[in-house]
């Protein structure tokens, strides 16, 4: 069980060779992941980092509004600068290097899930917690991607390992480390504060050293926030409070729903199965066994809190994964030995198959097309005539040439009435594709990017989804009249929840 009282045993020290194997496993994971999941993997970390290091790239509206911490792009820019100094900044290496660094960091998530299980559960459960973490389909698909949520999960796993769960036996040195790392995770994702608020309240209520715990919390959180404020000030060039701007955007202006809303119970019936995949039945059993433990209660509180927010995404509760994997490990040890081997490997196989498909097949065309455009000599300019942020950008293209895509900024500064009728640029295109291309582009392909009076121009290479060919053939006819020819195609997906992104990715070139 997830005991409040810590367990002392050999698993608290992990052999160096095991760490190397886990790190190598995650590097292989990162380098073999060929698909696209969500735009933030590129646009909120690698893209601003690329702009900072190389002087070109695109900053989305979040950066202009000061909603994001500068820590992720600063780390990325450091990687890119190192490549420059070593003379290794060719497109392929520029794409691979951040993956390797993220993979090494991600491996700490596996290690500290193991260590946390060893500390709170025991030597029987700890190896299974590591096993579940390594053979988790969602971990394989998501953990090594450059999302702030991935870093948030790793930092949460590390901080939990240092946390004091027994108020009667508080280790203040370890608690100080936990608070420091937990505060950094909140800088990356402010909503992670929900988890730490629940755990902190439990600790304060159960310890006799209340004032000392509170003082440690205030000191460490203030130290982290002061340091990151200074770093953000240097990055933005002016006083910026990303946390306050984040709260203003999501709570006061309530604009997050512009990017979609989900039913109240989404996290229970969809997100939890996505996070656990084949391990779901064991996870639910383990959570039930440990329903009285503070970590399980904290996880439930986080899910309930997120359920009250209209805009929901599975990655928002990703920091709970170590707790879910520990629950699955608990259930495995409770399974009769005669059934255990068959059950565990059957569920592991489900995870392996799901991980393979979604990391190798589903939505790979939008990544492949950018890698193709980055190396094709005849490419002098690029346009992405598809929903906004459908592909990586300069972090993968790595060519200082004119590039555009259809934008989708939210209605910031609009009245409630204006928000109801607001249509972003991508919406305007799909409302009437032919009219859009006839009115928003220069009349002739002879008009260069520099000469065009609008942000959109006729590029040498234009990427679209196959669905546009099928649903708006008149647009294709117009492109052909301008001199475009159908070129390379890239398989993207067998199915998609957005009709605009259905089918292959097709390149048209002059």
From Swiss-Prot:
Matching entries from Pfam families are given as: Glyco_transf_22
What pathway, per the record?
Glycolipid biosynthesis; glycosylphosphatidylinositol-anchor biosynthesis
InterPro entries cross-referenced by the UniProt entry: GPI_mannosylTrfase (IPR005599)
The primary location reported for this protein is endoplasmic reticulum
Glycan-linked positions: 290
Which Gene Ontology terms describe the biological processes this protein takes part in?
Answer: GPI anchor biosynthetic process
Broad EC category:
transferase
> Could you say which EC number(s) this protein's record lists?
2.4.1.-
**Which keywords are on file for this protein?**
Endoplasmic reticulum, Glycoprotein, Glycosyltransferase, GPI-anchor biosynthesis, Membrane, Transferase, Transmembrane, Transmembrane helix
Location(s), subcellular: Endoplasmic reticulum membrane
What is a single molecular function from GO for this protein? alpha-1,2-mannosyltransferase activity
Topological relation to the membrane, as annotated? Multi-pass membrane protein
Give TM segment ranges: 17-37, 96-116, 123-143, 145-163, 179-199, 221-241, 269-289, 316-336, 342-362
Q: What cellular component terms from Gene Ontology apply here?
A: endoplasmic reticulum membrane
Q: Which family does it belong to?
A: Belongs to the glycosyltransferase 22 family. PIGB subfamily.
Q: What does this protein do?
A: Mannosyltransferase involved in glycosylphosphatidylinositol-anchor biosynthesis. Transfers the third mannose to Man2-GlcN-acyl-PI during GPI precursor assembly.
* Name of the protein this chain belongs to: GPI mannosyltransferase 3
Gene that encodes the chain: GPI10
């Amino acid at each position: 069980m997830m005991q409040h009282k810590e367990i002392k045993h050999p698993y608290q020290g992990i052999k160096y060779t095991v760490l190397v194997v886990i790190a190598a496993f995650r590097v292989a994971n990162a380098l073999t992941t060929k698909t696209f999941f969500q735009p933030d993997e590129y646009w909120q970390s690698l893209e601003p980092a690329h702009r900072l290091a190389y002087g070109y790239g695109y900053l989305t509206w979040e950066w202009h509004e000061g909603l994001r911490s500068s820590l992720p792009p600063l780390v990325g820019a450091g990687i890119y600068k190192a490549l420059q100094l070593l003379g290794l900044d060719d497109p392929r290496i520029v794409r691979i290097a951040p993956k390797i660094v993220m993979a090494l960091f991600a491996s700490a998530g596996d290690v500290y899930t193991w260590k946390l299980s060893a500390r709170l559960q025991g030597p029987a459960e700890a190896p299974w917690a590591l096993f579940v973490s390594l053979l988790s389909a969602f971990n394989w698909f998501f953990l090594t991607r450059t999302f702030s949520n991935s870093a948030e999960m790793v930092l949460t796993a590390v901080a939990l390992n240092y946390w004091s769960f027994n108020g009667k036996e508080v280790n203040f040195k370890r608690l100080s480390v936990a608070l420091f790392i937990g505060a950094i995770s909140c800088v990356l994702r402010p909503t992670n504060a929900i988890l730490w608020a629940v755990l902190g309240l439990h600790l304060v209520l159960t310890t006799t050293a209340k004032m000392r715990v509170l003082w440690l919390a205030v000191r460490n959180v203030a130290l982290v926030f002061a340091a990151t404020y200074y770093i953000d000030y240097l990055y933005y060039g002016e006083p910026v409070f990303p946390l306050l701007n984040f709260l203003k955007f999501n709570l006061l202006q309530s604009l997050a729903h512009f990017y979609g809303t989900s039913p109240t119970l989404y996290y229970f019936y969809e997100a939890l199965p996505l996070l656990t995949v084949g391990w779901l039945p064991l996870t639910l059993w383990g959570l039930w066994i440990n329903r009285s433990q503070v970590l399980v209660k904290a996880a439930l509180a986080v899910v309930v809190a997120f359920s009250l927010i209209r805009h929901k995404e599975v990655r928002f509760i990703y920091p709970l994964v170590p707790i879910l994997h520990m629950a699955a490990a608990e259930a495995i040890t409770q399974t009769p030995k005669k059934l255990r081997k068959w059950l565990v490997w059957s569920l592991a196989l489900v995870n392996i198959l799901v991980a393979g498909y979604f990391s190798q097949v589903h939505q790979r065309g939008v990544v492949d097309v950018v890698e193709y455009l980055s190396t094709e000599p005849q490419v002098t300019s690029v346009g992405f005539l598809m929903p906004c942020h459908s592909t990586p950008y300069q972090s993968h293209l790595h060519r200082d040439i004119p590039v555009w895509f259809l934008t989708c900024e939210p209605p910031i500064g609009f009245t409630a009435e204006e928000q109801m009728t607001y249509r972003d640029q991508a919406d305007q295109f799909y409302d009437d594709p032919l009219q859009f291309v006839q009115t928003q582009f220069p009349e002739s392909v002879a008009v260069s990017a520099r000469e065009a009076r609008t942000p959109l121009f006729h590029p040498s290479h234009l990427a679209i989804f196959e669905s546009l060919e099928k649903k708006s053939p008149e647009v294709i006819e117009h492109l052909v009249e301008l001199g475009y020819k159908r070129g390379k195609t890239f398989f993207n997906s067998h199915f998609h929840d957005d009709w605009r992104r259905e089918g292959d990715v097709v390149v048209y070139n002059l």
